[in-house]
A protein has these predicted regions:
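Autoprocessing Asn-cyclization modules and mimics
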Residues: 1-66, 70, 78-79, 83-84, ...
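Extracellular beta-strand/beta-solenoid scaffold signature
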Residues: 1-9, 25, 85-95, 115-123, ...
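Extended Gly/Ser/Thr-rich low-complexity repeat segments
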Residues: 35-50, 83-102, 421-422, 455
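Right-handed parallel beta-helix
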Residues: 40, 46-70, 74, 100-196, ...
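Cys-His-centered catalytic/binding microenvironment captured across papain-like cysteine peptidases
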Residues: 55-64, 74-125, 237, 283-285, ...
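Catalytic domains of carbohydrate-active enzymes that cleave complex glycans
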Residues: 222-224, 236-237, 242-384
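C-terminal outer-membrane/trafficking sorting elements
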Residues: 390-471
Length: 471
């Protein structure tokens, strides 16, 4: 079974939308909103017949999102919708009771033996605002880390390698993001000797895979070369609007294993060192974006750039030293999710790292540099949430006294931020918006123990602090 599991639950009650909702809307209208409150996490789904192929993936095309406000028959959402929700597809909404603010850090996992189930070393299902940092995971069954029906999960500074099985049917994955999961950040990780290092399937949307390093892909049970398995993979059942940026791997595969992938998946400034970029064509997945990628191998049968389907956006891709399409050499875009160079790339002089106008095949990301130098995880480093803009993250606060017998003060807060205080069980016991840069909180009526203070911005958690209450 799963070695570590963070397991929330999906509420049984269903509410129905009463009108069409459209991509980029930040509200939905329901028959009744009485059961919903600001701060609730919900899953919006619909009849996705024709979009998903697999029975196990039905109902996964949608979005997991937090309610910002509730007024009359309208729910206002914390983020914009990433897909249309036509009334003819019978869109519905259900509350999620998630595992929140859990962290797994600074440990090594070794799966000592295989089992007959599709089990994972770390599994998150119906989880929100959770972090996995500095973990080495040795030998997988299905996936080293599986993220299902979750949002705002971050995985960074990890080393995931090897598997008991590399055959089909779900074996040998690094990080699997699936089942409507969205707004997750997979950043600065190292993958080695896996069937699929980074893989999306079953309605996953709005996720970012940034600046990871993957080597030695390997699969069995196929007539294709053993090192030709995709390590950056869209696996079908309508994944859409995801971003792969700054990764170094061996091949991007947009496959048809489980039918079509949805639109607007973006591959930006990645380097592929072996077979390159390949899309299956039965059926093809339309409307993909490929910008500033490098395909470097000149070995016979490698170095591919094969797309099928229609309405792809292509710009500035360097394929074996030649820019494709011709005439798109000038690419000024630096990042599609960062506003400036992130701290984990401080030791990398070239930024952006990959792609035109840089010299072809020059530059390494931090994960590749670390692997070359025998640094497989980064544990104990300051962890900054990647789900907010850089300006939102730049918060320097003081919390005192700590431990406290009752009252404590948080200074240095920017107006507009929010404070949420949770007990050790994850129960919200206090929340307040910052007005003047300082907040006084009284714990005198609560039990002794450890409490967590989340500093919140519009994009999620900016910083988490710990406070101890003791008499």
């Amino acid at each position: 079974g799963n070695l570590i599991s963070l397991q929330g639950r999906l509420d049984d009650d269903v509410a129905f939308l009463t009108g069409d909702a459209f991509r980029n809307d930040d509200f939905i209208i329901l028959t009744t909103t009485d059961a919903f409150n600001a701060g609730d996490l919900v899953r919006i789904s619909m009849d996705d017949t024709g979009l998903v192929t697999s029975d196990w993936a039905k109902g996964t095309v949608g979005q997991i999102i937090e309610i910002k406000d509730q007024r009359h028959d309208t729910l206002f959402l914390s983020e914009q919708l990433r897909l249309d929700l036509p009334l003819q597809r019978q869109p519905v909404i259900r509350k999620i009771d998630p595992v929140k603010y859990a962290g797994i850090e600074c440990l090594k996992i070794v799966r000592g033996s295989n089992d007959a189930f599709q089990s994972n070393n770390i599994s998150l299902e119906f989880a929100s605002n959770c972090l996995i940092n500095g973990v080495e995971s040795d030998s997988a069954n299905l996936a080293h880390i599986a993220v299902s029906s979750s949002s705002h999960v971050e995985v960074r500074n990890c080393y995931l390698h090897d598997s008991y099985d590399y055959g089909g049917g779900g074996k040998g994955y690094g990080i699997l993001v699936q089942a409507t999961s969205g707004d997750c950040l997979i950043e600065n990780n190292i993958f080695k000797h896996l069937r699929h290092s980074m893989i999306l399937q079953a309605g996953a949307n709005g996720n970012v895979f940034g600046y990871n390093y993957s080597i030695e892909p390997y699969w069995t049970g196929t007539t294709l070369p053993s090192n030709a398995s995709g390590d950056l993979v869209l696996h079908g059942n309508y994944v859409f609007s995801n971003l792969f940026e700054g990764n170094i791997g061996q091949q991007i595969v947009i496959d048809d294993s489980h039918g079509i992938n949805g639109p607007f998946n973006t591959f930006f400034r990645n380097r592929l060192e072996s077979y390159g970029i390949f899309m299956n064509n039965n059926p093809p997945s339309d409307s993909q974006n490929l910008v500033g990628n490098e395909v470097t191998s000149t070995v016979f049968t490698q170095g591919l750039y094969l797309l099928f389907g229609k309405d792809h956006f292509q710009y500035g891709n360097n394929i074996r030293g030649s820019i494709t399409p011709v005439g798109t050499e000038e690419l000024s875009d630096t990042s599609y999710y960062l506003t400036k160079k992130p701290p984990f790339l401080d030791d990398i002089s070239q930024y952006p790292i990959i792609g035109t106008p840089n010299v072809f095949k020059s530059g390494k990301n931090s994960a590749a540099f670390n692997f070359t130098n025998g640094i497989f995880t980064r544990c104990g480093d300051d962890v900054i949430s990647g789900n907010q803009s850089i300006s939102e993250r730049e918060v320097s606060v003081a919390l005192y006294p700590n431990p406290t017998r009752g009252n404590f003060i948080i200074n240095g807060l920017k107006p507009g931020l929010g404070i949420r205080l949770y007990d050790i069980m994850g129960k919200l016991i206090f929340q307040q918006e910052v007005v003047n840069g300082s907040i006084n909180i009284d714990l005198s009526g609560f039990n002794n123990g450890l409490y967590f203070v989340n500093i919140m911005a519009a994009g999620g958690i900016v910083q988490t602090l710990k406070i101890v209450k003791m008499n």
